[in-house]
């Protein structure tokens, strides 16, 4: 029997606002536990939340980036549950009136493009963080009240590969808006998955299993692939799939049962009494839309049509906003687009992967990369010398000064090079005869002798011109 797979994804994205969604506490990653909290975050009786307008603005921008319909009228709801990292015993979220709905993202897998629908997007607050030891459990409420958007896909994803492509496209578009860092390693992007399979041709969805807080795209793919095969084995053996929540074990590459679910959770949602409904005008939506930065697709089109890059180059450069912004700044500073792109995609990416750092964490600047590229373009340094200059600009050195200080500037003055050419020719009469007899290798040998005398600093183009002129005059 052949099966078809259906995958749904819920993605929580932490917004990069200065303060929390309902309190004035700052939003900072990595601070001391409970340093960024106040009585609203602690859930003290009698305190009232105040909605951060910037969160609504960012939510609208995210909705626009995902081609979604923006709600003109919305309210907030209480989701009731108790857990130590949720001192209010409820979460303020959106149940009935999400801020955006019916969006889509285009993905490409194995050369085929496909639109994945987005059912809805909610604004909500994050919970705190529990840490457990053998003796104690600790609660850190720094994260409590951090603004989130929850993006729920439609059941359009048909494979683990499509799931990862969707997540990559989603992260990319959100990142380019600037409203979130979407860094999974810092928890600013978290992924919950559900998966089911059914016989091909069947209209009835199979029973789904859930997996929560998978912390990398690679593990999302592996977890879904394992579950897909597990479902198939169970059904082919005549068994049935239970409605379960499972977790992915990174060590074994398998999923492990956490709990079974007899029905849907009852969170006893009801409208939040301490926050008024929110009305969003067409004028405000238009204003936010006018502030939207270029999306990856628009930048790719510009790079190909206006800057002469290949489709592949444009795709690589727009994988992250950080790399794309760096490229544009370097080109603005006078760097040749193709040469800048090559350095970013090869030398820079290799360095980042080797050091396991982000571009923003290095001392490399767009102006210094552009400066080095211009030195290559005008013949001040050779491509071979540029490798040494590149090491300098990685340490924050100005390329022109570094090249001069370390003796990496090419000899390009004909007045300096001609005597060297003459000396080499005087010492290699046989090579001159070989050249006259049509042996092209003689030119290469003479070039090598000149480069040897100048310790590799002679400009090959200038040397070639002088050498050929001198040989023809013999």
UniProtKB/Swiss-Prot annotation:
Record-linked HAMAP family: GatB
Family: Belongs to the GatB/GatE family. GatB subfamily.
Xref: Gene3D superfamilies: 1.10.10.410, GatB domain, N-terminal subdomain
InterPro entries according to UniProt: Asn/Gln-tRNA_amidoTrfase_suB/E, Asn/Gln-tRNA_Trfase_suB/E_cat, Asn/Gln_amidotransferase, Asn/Gln_tRNA_amidoTrase-B-like, GatB, GatB_C_1, GatB_Yqey_C_2, Gln-tRNA_amidoTrfase_suB_CS
Enzyme class: ligase
Catalytic function, reaction form: L-glutamyl-tRNA(Gln) + L-glutamine + ATP + H2O = L-glutaminyl-tRNA(Gln) + L-glutamate + ADP + phosphate + H(+); L-aspartyl-tRNA(Asn) + L-glutamine + ATP + H2O = L-asparaginyl-tRNA(Asn) + L-glutamate + ADP + phosphate + 2 H(+)
Keyword Ribonucleoprotein: no
Subunit structure: Heterotrimer of A, B and C subunits.
Primary gene name: gatB
SMART domains linked: GatB_Yqey (SM00845)
Record organism: Limosilactobacillus reuteri (strain DSM 20016) (Lactobacillus reuteri)
Listed Pfam families: GatB_N, GatB_Yqey
EC number, UniProt record: 6.3.5.-
GO biological process, one term: glutaminyl-tRNAGln biosynthesis via transamidation
Known function: Allows the formation of correctly charged Asn-tRNA(Asn) or Gln-tRNA(Gln) through the transamidation of misacylated Asp-tRNA(Asn) or Glu-tRNA(Gln) in organisms which lack either or both of asparaginyl-tRNA or glutaminyl-tRNA synthetases. The reaction takes place in the presence of glutamine and ATP through an activated phospho-Asp-tRNA(Asn) or phospho-Glu-tRNA(Gln).
NCBIfam families recorded: gatB (TIGR00133), PRK05477.1-1 (NF004011), PRK05477.1-2 (NF004012), PRK05477.1-4 (NF004014)
Keywords assigned by UniProt, alphabetized: ATP-binding, Ligase, Nucleotide-binding, Protein biosynthesis
Gene Ontology MF: a single term: ATP binding
Protein name: Aspartyl/glutamyl-tRNA(Asn/Gln) amidotransferase subunit B
PROSITE patterns: GATB
């Amino acid at each position: 029997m052949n099966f078809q797979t259906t995958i749904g994804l819920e993605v929580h994205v932490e917004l990069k606002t200065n303060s929390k969604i309902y309190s004035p506490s700052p939003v900072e990653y990595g601070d001391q536990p409970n340093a960024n909290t106040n009585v609203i975050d602690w859930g003290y009786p009698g305190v009232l939340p105040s909605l951060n307008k910037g969160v609504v603005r960012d939510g609208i921008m995210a909705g626009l980036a995902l081609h979604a319909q923006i709600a003109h009228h919305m309210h907030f709801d209480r989701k009731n549950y108790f857990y130590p990292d949720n001192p209010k015993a409820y979460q303020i979220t959106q149940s009935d009136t999400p801020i955006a709905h019916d969006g889509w993202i285009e993905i490409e897998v194995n050369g085929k493009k496909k639109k994945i629908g987005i059912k809805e997007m909610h604004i909500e607050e994050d919970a705190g963080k529990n840490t457990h030891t053998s003796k104690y459990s600790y609660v850190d409420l720094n994260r409590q009240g951090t603004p989130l958007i929850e993006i729920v896909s439609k059941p359009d994803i048909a494979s683990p590969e499509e799931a990862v492509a969707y997540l990559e496209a989603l992260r990319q578009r959100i990142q380019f808006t600037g409203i979130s860092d979407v860094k999974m390693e810092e928890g600013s992007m978290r992924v919950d998955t559900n998966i089911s399979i059914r016989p091909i041709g069947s209209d009835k969805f199979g029973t789904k299993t859930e997996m929560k807080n998978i912390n990398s795209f690679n593990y999302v793919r592996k977890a879904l692939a394992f579950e897909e095969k597990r479902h198939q084995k169970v059904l082919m053996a005549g068994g049935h799939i239970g409605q379960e929540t499972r977790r992915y074990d990174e060590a074994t590459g398998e999923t492990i049962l956490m709990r079974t679910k007899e029905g849907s959770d009852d969170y006893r949602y009801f409208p939040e009494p301490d926050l008024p409904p929110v009305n969003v005008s067409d004028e405000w939506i238009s204003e936010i839309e006018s502030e939207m930065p270029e999306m990856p697709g628009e930048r790719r089109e510009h790079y190909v049509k206006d800057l002469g890059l290949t489709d592949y180059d444009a795709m690589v450069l727009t994988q992250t906003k950080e790399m794309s912004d760096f490229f544009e700044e370097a080109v603005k500073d006078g760097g040749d687009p193709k040469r800048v792109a090559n350095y970013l995609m090869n030398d820079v990416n290799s360095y980042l992967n080797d050091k396991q750092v982000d571009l923003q964490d290095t001392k490399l600047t767009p102006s210094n990369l552009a400066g080095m590229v211009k030195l290559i373009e005008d013949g001040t340094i050779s491509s071979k010398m540029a490798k040494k200059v590149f090491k300098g600009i990685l340490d924050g050195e100005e390329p022109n000064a570094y090249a001069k200080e370390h003796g990496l500037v090419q000899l390009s003055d004909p007045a300096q090079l001609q005597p060297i050419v003459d000396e080499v020719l005087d010492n290699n009469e046989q090579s001159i005869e070989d050249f006259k007899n049509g042996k092209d290798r003689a030119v290469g040998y003479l070039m090598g002798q000149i480069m040897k005398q100048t310790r590799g600093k002679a400009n090959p183009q200038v040397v070639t011109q002088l050498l050929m002129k001198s040989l023809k005059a013999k």
